[in-house]
Amino acid sequence: MDKQPKQTNTPEDWRILAERDITVADYLAANMRPVPAEIIAFHCQQAAEKYLKGALVILGEEPPYTHDLDELCSLAEKHRSTFVSISSSCSIITHFSVQPRYDRGVSLSEEDMRLVLSHTKTIKGFLQKEIPSLFGEGQQGMEQ
């Protein structure tokens, strides 16, 4: 019980965690009724955050301890201007981090939740093209 959990710091660690979150979001959206929109949006935010942190590691940046996707995207933009293309998706999703998960007053429509899910997949798709080594393709060293 004294063992510390392994620190997440490799791109692969971040990607695996992100994939778990997006898989949970997809599963809940497809199978649970009523649809738990806020929980799905939370998992979407978490997936996007972890994908971005994995990308930052590949870009040579230590990911900060933050849930703010705008901040993570801005850090990545310093290395590659192309990250501006996902900045609006990051801005939409960032609001669904920890607080909405516990705020019983937050209500999200299924339509809005599906939009959040779509933006998360936009971020993932961008990263698959921009930084393929995050997904096990290509050489990490060649991407910086």
Give, region by region, the residue ranges found by the protein language model:
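Terminal alpha-helical segments
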Residues: 1-144
